[in-house]
């Protein structure tokens, strides 16, 4: 991701409840403005099927371009399986969407621009791609400031060296080992189609025109509503919501 952002307009409405499974058009319209280690963190703003929506990213391996439009399939958390999300197709354990829901909730509940929100975002990326997160942070260490790489790694993995595996009591361990289920979260997975087809792309395989995103299935107040009020800060320009491995010039598996 780049750091060039311009304020340009006003976003209007909350997302409405979608069908359990449906195809839709998505345009990525903005970022929350917070970046860490050269990368913008969640939440982001998108137009999903004509509705302005706050979205959170759970995909560290692929990339999304601000202003780009793509076809995607929406799947409610209660209907997630191995064939209807990009991570499911990649062979990921779909039970981990319970952890994704927990961390998405933390991202949206954290103070905008806070170190807590940075930690929650990177922990969410680490659910399906812990090694990718570890490799990027190891290659781009931050040694000073309000949140060093060692502090971030300690919060996510329980180890300042960012081992890629979660120690008991760490944020990632709590998310994955507290019995959270996908069905308990009122959220929807937004998985991109392979360009020119109605076939879902597979995360980490290089055929995704955008990352996988998560959004609230039902319009509700609190943090998500606050973010939509802030979403008047639409963004323009060539900003990338990128995989850290790509920014580090590493190839994608």
Q: What residue spans do the PLM features occupy?
A:
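Sec/Tat signal peptide C-region and signal peptidase I cleavage site
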Residues: 16-22
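Short, surface-exposed polybasic-aromatic patches that bind anionic ligands, especially phosphate groups
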Residues: 23-216
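A short, hydrophobic C-terminal helix/tail in secreted or cell-surface proteins
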Residues: 219-241
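C-terminal membrane-anchoring or membrane-association module
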Residues: 236-253
């Amino acid at each position: 991701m780049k750091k060039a952002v311009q304020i340009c307009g006003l976003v209007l409405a909350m997302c409405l409840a979608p069908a359990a499974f449906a195809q839709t058009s998505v345009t990525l319209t903005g970022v929350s403005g917070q970046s860490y280690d050269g990368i913008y963190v969640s939440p982001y703003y998108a137009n999903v099927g004509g509705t302005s929506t706050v979205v959170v990213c759970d995909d560290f391996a692929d990339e999304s371009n601000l202003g780009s439009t793509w076809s995607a399939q929406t799947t409610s958390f209660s209907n997630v399986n191995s064939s209807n999300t990009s991570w499911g197709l990649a062979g990921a354990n779909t039970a981990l969407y319970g952890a994704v829901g927990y961390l998405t909730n933390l991202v949206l509940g954290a103070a905008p621009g806070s170190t807590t929100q940075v930690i929650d975002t990177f922990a969410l990326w680490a659910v399906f791609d812990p090694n990718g997160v570890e490799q990027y942070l190891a290659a781009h260490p931050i040694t000073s400031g309000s949140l060093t790489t060692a502090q971030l790694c300690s919060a996510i993995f329980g180890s300042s060296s960012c081992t890629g595996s979660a120690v008991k009591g760490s944020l990632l361990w709590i998310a994955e080992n507290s019995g959270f289920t996908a069905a308990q979260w009122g959220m929807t997975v937004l998985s991109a189609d392979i360009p020119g087809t109605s076939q879902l792309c597979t995360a980490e395989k290089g055929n995704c025109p955008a990352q996988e995103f998560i959004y609230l299935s039902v319009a509700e107040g609190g943090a998500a509503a606050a973010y939509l009020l802030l979403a008047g800060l639409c963004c323009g320009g060539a900003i990338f919501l990128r995989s850290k491995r790509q920014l580090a010039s590493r190839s994608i598996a």
